[in-house]
UniProtKB/Swiss-Prot annotation:
Gene3D superfamilies: Single helix bin. The keyword DNA repair does not apply. Residues 1-15 have a biased composition (Basic residues). GO terms for molecular function: structural constituent of ribosome. One of its GO terms (cellular component) is large ribosomal subunit. It holds the Pfam family Ribosomal_L32p. Residues 1-21 are annotated as: Disordered. This is Large ribosomal subunit protein bL32. Keywords: Ribonucleoprotein, Ribosomal protein. Belongs to the bacterial ribosomal protein bL32 family. NCBIfam families: rpmF_bact. It comes from Alkaliphilus metalliredigens (strain QYMF).
Amino acid sequence: MAVPKRKTSKSKRDMRRASNSKFVAPGYVKCPQCHETKLPHRVCPDCGHYNGKEVIAAE
């Protein structure tokens, strides 16, 4: 059975655990119609356009 030869330090242990919990911000793109930021592959919440067409009526 595999056994560690040396004790893993708290720093090494914490760095290993922290690498799995990095915060990744979503990539934003600019809407080609109103130039506001929006999430990709979604209808623009400001103007209601998607893929060059008005999908929902914006107020």
